Structure formats: structure tokens, C-alpha cells
């Protein structure tokens, strides 16, 4: 019965997302909330200038409303779901402010890096203080084994790193039409299966609400995109997936299931270090998806390849997290 409930959860979130998007996109156009395209980006992206952004609000509303209603309906509105809603709201709010400054105040960089970091830190600290001992404990598990290591207060540092790093890594992935929507749906789908295996049904409901919401958004975000999610969506999704991994005690497994996000982030780190130390670039452009674009791949080919990689990594993660 619960399995059907999870499918219903995804279905409801999908329908809300699909229903809201056609109403919200013209509203964004009317407000002239269009995406600015950086001059240093791929030239093929210049035609996307003016495409409505902040569409992440649709994802945000769809998954928050659905997960809350379904968690109440199935009596799983506990500490875990409450924490996930807190993180999603907090990081989504930071993303919203960042987008708002970019498109309304016409300040291309949005929030300063310090402002964004302070906001991310506040949410991460609140998550740790509220959840410690109630929704999660301060040890990590080796994936596929019963081996655990108690970290004590060092776990606090890990939580900060995961939430801040996770939100930024997912944000970096949001650079091509449909790329993040698809990879996020795959990753949250994998974690929902692990959550069911652990009988963490509240977390599973939340994950399936995200899956439905991003797939509904993908209908309008696939190439050629009619709307972008902006930081409103990407930061919320990044914070949420890191929080899910923490609550399921699959902190290390996030590196595999979120492997696409990790690769995107590493490409940026490698590029910066290489250029600062040698004056040479390893990639034609970072994050990694832009490198393949400049190698002559079509945008759709890059997106499908990254989706495929995300799917294979998700299957590996499920195998380790459930069957091993």
C-alpha cells in the first residue's frame, strides 16, 4: 500500500508542477525575470538570453506542498521530514534572493559569495543542532557494510561540508536545458529506494515528491527550455539531497549517487588550480558540461550522456546501499 502511496506522491507533485508551470512562465515574462547569459560562456547560449528564470519556485512549491500533505496523510510527518522541509525552504530562500538580485536589481552576480555562505552556514548549523540525536547520530557508515565510525563533533564539520558543498555542486550542474532536472530526478529516485529499504518512509515520501516535481518541471525545461529553475531551484535541490543522505546515514554513498554533481565540481576545482599554478586550462571550459559543448557535442547529447551516467551511478548506489 505504501509503495502505491509513493507513486501517488510522485504523481501528485508531477501534476502540480505541470499545472503551475504554464501559469507561472507568462507571469515571469511579464515581470521581465529573464536570464542573463555571461559573455564568457559558450556562444550558442546567447540565444537563451531573456528566457524566464526563477522557475525553481514551481519545483519548490510542488515538492513542499506534496511532501507535507502526503507525510501527514500517511502519518510520517516526523523530525526527518520536518528537517528536510527546513533545509529545502532555507536553501530555496537563499537561491530566491540570489535570483531576485540578479534579475530585478540587475546585479549579475546576485548575492555576494560571503552573503551566500553565511546563509548556507546558518541553515546547516540549524539542521545539525535540531537533528542531532533526534533524526540522526554522529557516526558514518561504510556503504555496503555494518562498519561504523563515531565522529563526535567532527560530524558537525561533515554536515556543514555536505550541505554547503552539496548545494553548490548541484548549482554548478544547472547549466544546460534539462540537465539538472533529469539528474536530480534520478538521484532522488535512488535515495527513495534506499529509504524504503531502511523503512524511512517519511524520507521516501519527500524524495518521491521531489522526483515528481522536477519531472513535471522538465516538461518545460527540456531543450529548448521555456524556463530555467535558477538558484531558487538548484540550491534547494542541492541542500535537500545532502540532507537526505545524512538522514539515511549514506553520507559516503552520496559521492556515488550524486557522482555527476561531484564530477562537475571537481572539473571546476581542477580548472582553477591548474590555471592558477601553471597558467593552463585542463578543460576548454568548466563546469564539465561546457567542455563537451566546446568539443562539438550538441547540448542534447551532453544532457543525455550525463543523465545516462547519473542513472548508472544511481543503480550502483542502490546495489551498494540496499543489496550489499
Swiss-Prot record:
Main localization, broad class: membrane
InterPro entries: Glycosyl_transferase_4 (IPR000715), PNAcMuramoyl-5peptid_Trfase (IPR003524), PNAcMuramoyl-5peptid_Trfase_CS (IPR018480)
Cofactor(s) required, per the database record: Mg(2+)
EC top class, as a word: transferase
Catalytic activity line of the entry: UDP-N-acetyl-alpha-D-muramoyl-L-alanyl-gamma-D-glutamyl-meso-2,6-diaminopimeloyl-D-alanyl-D-alanine + di-trans,octa-cis-undecaprenyl phosphate = di-trans,octa-cis-undecaprenyl diphospho-N-acetyl-alpha-D-muramoyl-L-alanyl-D-glutamyl-meso-2,6-diaminopimeloyl-D-alanyl-D-alanine + UMP
Presence of the UniProt keyword Cell membrane in the record: yes
BP-aspect Gene Ontology terms: cell division; cell wall macromolecule biosynthetic process; cell wall organization; peptidoglycan biosynthetic process; regulation of cell shape
Any Pfam family: MraY_sig1
Transmembrane stretches, start-end: 5-25, 52-72, 77-97, 122-142, 149-169, 176-196, 201-221, 227-247, 253-273, 302-322
Keywords: Cell cycle, Cell division, Cell membrane, Cell shape, Cell wall biogenesis/degradation, Magnesium, Membrane, Metal-binding, Peptidoglycan synthesis, Transferase, Transmembrane, Transmembrane helix
GO MF annotations in UniProt: metal ion binding; phospho-N-acetylmuramoyl-pentapeptide-transferase activity; phosphotransferase activity, for other substituted phosphate groups; UDP-N-acetylmuramoyl-L-alanyl-D-glutamyl-meso-2,6-diaminopimelyl-D-alanyl-D-alanine:undecaprenyl-phosphate transferase activity
Compartment list: Cell membrane
GO cellular component, one term: plasma membrane
Pathway: Cell wall biogenesis; peptidoglycan biosynthesis
Record-linked PANTHER family: PHOSPHO-N-ACETYLMURAMOYL-PENTAPEPTIDE-TRANSFERASE (PTHR22926), PHOSPHO-N-ACETYLMURAMOYL-PENTAPEPTIDE-TRANSFERASE HOMOLOG (PTHR22926:SF5)
Classification via HAMAP family: MraY
UniProt name for this protein: Phospho-N-acetylmuramoyl-pentapeptide-transferase
Underlying gene: mraY
Amino acid at each position: 500500500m505504501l509503495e502505491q502511496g509513493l507513486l501517488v506522491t510522485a504523481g501528485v507533485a508531477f501534476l502540480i508542477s505541470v499545472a503551475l508551470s504554464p501559469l507561472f512562465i507568462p507571469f515571469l515574462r511579464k515581470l521581465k525575470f529573464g536570464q542573463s547569459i555571461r559573455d564568457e560562456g559558450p556562444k550558442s547560449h546567447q540565444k537563451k538570453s531573456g528566457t524566464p528564470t526563477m522557475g525553481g519556485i514551481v519545483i519548490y512549491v510542488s515538492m513542499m506542498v506534496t511532501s507535507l500533505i502526503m507525510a501527514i496523510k500517511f502519518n510520517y510527518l516526523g523530525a526527518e521530514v520536518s528537517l528536510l522541509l527546513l533545509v529545502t525552504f532555507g536553501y530555496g530562500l537563499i537561491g530566491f534572493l540570489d535570483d531576485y538580485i540578479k534579475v530585478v536589481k540587475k546585479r549579475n552576480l546576485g548575492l555576494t559569495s560571503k552573503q551566500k555562505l553565511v546563509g548556507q552556514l546558518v541553515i546547516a548549523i540549524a539542521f545539525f543542532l535540531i537533528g542531532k540525536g533526534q533524526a540522526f547520530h554522529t557516526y558514518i557508515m561504510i556503504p555496503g557494510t555494518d562498519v561504523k565510525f563515531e565522529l563526535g563533533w567532527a560530524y558537525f564539520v561533515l554536515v556543514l561540508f555536505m550541505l554547503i558543498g552539496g548545494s553548490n555542486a548541484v548549482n554548478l550542474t544547472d547549466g544546460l536545458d534539462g540537465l539538472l532536472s533529469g539528474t536530480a530526478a534520478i538521484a532522488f529516485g535512488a535515495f527513495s529506494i534506499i529509504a524504503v529499504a531502511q523503512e524511512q518512509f517519511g524520507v521516501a515520501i519527500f524524495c518521491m515528491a521531489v522526483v515528481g516535481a522536477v519531472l513535471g518541471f522538465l516538461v518545460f525545461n527540456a531543450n529548448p527550455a521555456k524556463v530555467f529553475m535558477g538558484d531558487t531551484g538548484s540550491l534547494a535541490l542541492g541542500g535537500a539531497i545532502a540532507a537526505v543522505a545524512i538522514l539515511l546515514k549514506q553520507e559516503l554513498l552520496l559521492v556515488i549517487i550524486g557522482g555527476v554533481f561531484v564530477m562537475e565540481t571537481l572539473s571546476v576545482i581542477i580548472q582553477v588550480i591548474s590555471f592558477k599554478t601553471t597558467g593552463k586550462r585542463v578543460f576548454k571550459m568548466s563546469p564539465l558540461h561546457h567542455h563537451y559543448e566546446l568539443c562539438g557535442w550538441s547540448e542534447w547529447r551532453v544532457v543525455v550522456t550525463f543523465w545516462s551516467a547519473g542513472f548508472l551511478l544511481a543503480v550502483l548506489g542502490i546495489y551498494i546501499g540496499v543489496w550489499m
